[in-house]
Amino acid sequence: MADQSSLFLSRPCDVSKYGLIWAGVQKNVGPAGMSIVIIREDLIREDLPEFVPTYLRYKTHADADSLYNTPNCWSIYCCGKVFQYLLANGGLEAMAQRNEEKATVLYDFLDRSQFFTAAVRKEDRSLMNVPFFSPSKEQDAEVAASAKAAGFDNLKGHKSVGGLRASIYNAMPKEGVEALVDFLKKYEAEHT
């Protein structure tokens, strides 16, 4: 089982390795308000405890060809546009390469920085969300505020971790990551 919300469609995935993949579409696929479920047939069961509501039973949706309720047509339309874009631009292999390049730009800077510190060990790093820290919580807040003033929104870290976080999902172009690194370099030069 895997929640792949952050990495769904960011790279190829062998779905045969999973019994169930769930993904909220709001990261890489479309607007918030829809989820995608890929489930192995043997896990679509009828023998669930009575307290599980009808809507939360995967069999309900499988039997109704995913049309148990009125679908979110706008999200489906937008997702379709994303699928067309991915197919027209090299598929998931090409997207994986672009995402690797973007993440490398940011991680290379963080690994060389004397001011900022990458929050995650190299072998565990995400290509979609890059958490990092400045020397202090107060400095993190100042970096986030300065970044916002410079046009870089939502750099504040996740509420459970703190620090800073750059979300560089599929829609973020490499040029956007390079611009962020330029901003961080300038900020570091002005504060060391």
Tell where the protein language model's regions lie, with residue ranges.
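Short beta-strand-to-loop capping motifs
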Residues: 39, 132-136, 168-170
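Catalytic PLP-binding core of fold-type I/II PLP enzymes
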Residues: 1-16
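Active-site C-terminal subdomain of aminotransferase-like
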Residues: 25-107, 121, 190-192
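General beta-strand structural signal in soluble alpha/beta enzymes
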Residues: 1-4, 22-24, 154-157
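Conserved PLP-binding catalytic core of the aspartate aminotransferase-like
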Residues: 116-147
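PLP-dependent enzyme catalytic core of the Aspartate aminotransferase-like
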Residues: 149, 158-192
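A short linear hydrophobic-aromatic micro-motif
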Residues: 115-119, 151-157
